[in-house]
């Protein structure tokens, strides 16, 4: 009986110890990275000028290829996951859901060639790569295929989300903004 209670108590405190390890890992790992990326992104926005970024986003928003292919790729390569998603704030309301759909997937599809983008989910690519390595097959074609299929998929995710957003706009009787309007922005 004492052994069962002791084992239960050790398990219970072990739960909190493991939680502490995870928290410490986040405090020393992902949180400083995210804070640094936020600082750099905001510094770049201030350096370049918010109005210029808004105009660039507005131009990208006018074209589905740039909206769901170009901007997510550049944002993902430069700002990594999850900061690329925050670039959506420069999109008009009408395209924010679609941008998110395309950009969130680009964080996965670019991982094979650029592992810095999403190191937390690199295990998906590495799992497939380990099978090829076991078979003594090259990894280059896998990484390139992963990227190219991902780019096409990113575009279609954004485009299909555009269509579903239009359906919901019509059903709900609303019209989402097609221009960028940020608080405190000088247009």
Swiss-Prot record:
GO terms for biological process: phosphoenolpyruvate-dependent sugar phosphotransferase system; sorbitol transmembrane transport. Keywords: Cell inner membrane, Cell membrane, Membrane, Phosphotransferase system, Sugar transport, Transmembrane, Transmembrane helix, Transport. It is found in: Cell inner membrane. GO terms for cellular component: plasma membrane; transmembrane transporter complex. Residues 50-67, 153-187 are cytoplasmic. Residues 1-28, 89-131 are periplasmic. Residues 1-187 form the PTS EIIC type-5 domain. The keyword DNA repair does not apply. Coiled coil: none annotated. The chain crosses the membrane at residues 29-49, 68-88, 132-152. It is a multi-pass membrane protein. Induction: Regulated by an unusual system which consists of the activator GutM and the repressor GutR in addition to the cAMP-CRP complex. The keyword Transmembrane helix applies. Pfam families: EII-GUT (PF03608). NCBIfam families: EII-GUT (TIGR00821). The EIIC domain forms the PTS system translocation channel and contains the specific substrate-binding site. The phosphoenolpyruvate-dependent sugar phosphotransferase system (PTS), a major carbohydrate active transport system, catalyzes the phosphorylation of incoming sugar substrates concomitant with their translocation across the cell membrane. The enzyme II complex composed of SrlA, SrlB and SrlE is involved in glucitol/sorbitol transport. It can also use D-mannitol. This is PTS system glucitol/sorbitol-specific EIIC component.
């Amino acid at each position: 009986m004492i052994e069962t209670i002791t084992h239960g108590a050790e398990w219970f405190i072990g739960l909190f110890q493991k939680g502490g390890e995870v928290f410490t890992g986040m405090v020393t790992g992902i949180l400083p990275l995210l804070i640094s990326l936020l600082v750099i992104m905001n510094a770049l926005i201030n350096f370049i000028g918010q109005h210029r970024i808004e105009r660039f986003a507005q131009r990208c928003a006018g074209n589905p290829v740039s909206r769901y292919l170009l901007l997510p790729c550049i944002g993902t390569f430069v700002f990594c996951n999850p900061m690329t998603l925050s670039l959506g704030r420069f999109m008009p309301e009408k395209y924010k859901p679609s941008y998110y759909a395309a950009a969130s997937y680009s964080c996965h599809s670019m991982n094979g060639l650029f592992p810095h983008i999403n190191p937390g989910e690199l295990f998906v690519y590495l799992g497939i790569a380990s099978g090829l390595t076991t078979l003594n097959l090259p990894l280059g074609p896998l990484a390139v295929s992963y990227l190219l299929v991902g780019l096409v998929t990113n575009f279609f995710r954004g485009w299909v989300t555009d269509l579903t957003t239009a359906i919901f706009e019509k059903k709900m009787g609303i019209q989402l903004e097609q221009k960028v309007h940020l608080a405190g922005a000088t247009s």
